[in-house]
Each structure stands twice: as C-alpha cells, then as structure tokens.
Amino acid sequence: GAYLTIMVLLGVFSLFFAWQLKQTYAYGFAAVCGVCFLVSCYPVFFSYGTWPVRPWYVLEVVCLMGVYPLIARLQGKIVKLPQRLIRVETVILSGGMVLAGVFFMFGAGNARFGQIYALLLFLYKTGCALCLLYQAFRAYRNEVCKTPVLLVGTVLFGASLVADRMYPGYEPIYGGWFQEIGLFMLVLSIGYELAKDLA
C-alpha cells in the first residue's frame, strides 16, 4: 500500500514540475512511476478477489519489461550520455517487452519454450543491470553526479535482480519481491537526482 502511494505521489509531483517548471526529465520520471505503479498493482488487485490470470499477469510482465528501457533512457539523459547511445540502449532494452509478448502469445504452457524464455529473461535482466551500472558509474567517475546516490541505487537494483534469480522460490509475504524493492530504491535515487537539479 505504501509503495503504491509513494509511486502515485512521485508521479503526480513529477507531472506538476514538468508542467510548471518545464522540466523535461520530469515527464520521463512520471512515466517510470506510472509503470512501477502498474507492476505493483497486480498482487494488490488479486488480493481483493478472484480474477482470471490473463490478461492481468501478462500486463504486469510487459510493464515490468517496459520499465527497464524507460529507466535506462531517463538515467542516460540525467547522466548526459550521448543521444545516439541512449537511443540504441532504449531500442535494445525494449526487446524485453517483445520477448514477453511473444512468450505469452505463443509459448505459454510449452515447457521447453518456458526454459528458453527463463534463460533469455535472465540474460535480459543481467544486461539491463550492467547497462544501468555502467551509466551510473560513468556519471559518478566523471562527476556528472556529485553524490554516489544514483550509483548506490543502481547497485541495489542490480543486486535485487541477482537475488531474484538466486531465490526463485522466495515468497514475498513480508518483504515484497526483490525486483520491486530494488526498483523502488532506483526510482528514489533517480528522483533524488532530479530534485537536486530543481533545487
């Protein structure tokens, strides 16, 4: 509940700043918050009743795959990467949404295809984490970001993806999913960098 509330508030404040102060990064941050909200709505939605898994689970997975290119694009702009590199990263990382869509349209229920999908998903998440870590480390080393907040948030996010693969049977009754916790930390660190620019 608190996670969803924070995402909504961050998204609303971002839209306000984007509109009032013409802060272009704020629109991207609002989109990231909105997609994070959609990803986290799925378990809450299902706690209030019995619903068919399709299309809701598919929507959650596609949104989760969609948040990675959004974050990479936003982080790339914050750390002032070359525009061409940002575009290439965004296109490559958007492949995760295509991968998830293809799996759920054609391969759901096929055990062999499921194994291939799990391997590709692992490689995709590893690539996302490495891409974001490279961007954050480069920004900190080149002093684009004066504090290590973005780097720390990105390291926590990368660690959450590793933990998600190491403990696939983890039941998130108390702590939440590893990915959600890591994503939350990364969103807060990006929000901090954007707020610092506004100050």
Model feature map: region roles:
Residues 1, 24, 197-199:
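Short, intrinsically disordered, charge-balanced linker/junction segments flanking boundaries
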Residues 1-14:
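Extracytoplasmic
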Residues 13-24:
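Short, hydrophobic transmembrane alpha-helix segments
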Residues 29:
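Secretory-pathway-linked proteins and extracytosolic
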Residues 33, 37-199:
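Interfacial "cap-and-anchor" motif at the non-cytosolic start of specific transmembrane alpha-helices
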